[in-house]
A protein has these predicted regions:
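HIT superfamily nucleotide-processing domains
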Residues: 1-113
Length: 113
């Protein structure tokens, strides 16, 4: 999509600190980190929500989830990490291109709203 921030990053139109890239995904440093280590794993196909993905996009998300553990050392995830996929504005989604937050580098608690 021409107005999507992540599509522009994928296309190289907007700079980002790339940690990994292949034909299915790009992993970048978050510009507004919520943890010591905060990365975004972004599938290269544009869709907003898990409920919207087709089979090809579902395979792409699966490949993202399988790739993240292989990058533990490079991303500083060795002591544990959290994956978050926000679904919709009320859940905290601010860029409406599905992406996986990868958070690590500190002990994380859990305080439900």
């Amino acid at each position: 999509m021409s107005d999507c921030l992540f599509c522009k990053i994928i296309a190289g139109e907007i700079p980002a600190t790339k940690m990994y890239e292949d034909e299915n995904m790009i992993i970048i440093k978050d510009i507004d980190p919520k943890a010591k280590n905060h990365f975004l794993c972004i599938p290269k196909s544009h869709f907003k929500l898990l409920a919207e993905m087709d089979e090809t996009q579902a395979e792409m998300v699966k490949k993202c989830l399988k790739k993240i553990p292989t990058l533990e050392k490079e991303l500083g995830l060795s002591n544990g990490y959290r994956l978050v996929i926000n679904q919709g504005e009320d859940a905290g989604q601010t860029v409406f291109h599905l992406h996986i937050h990868i958070l690590s580098g500190q002990k994380m608690g859990w305080t439900p709203a």
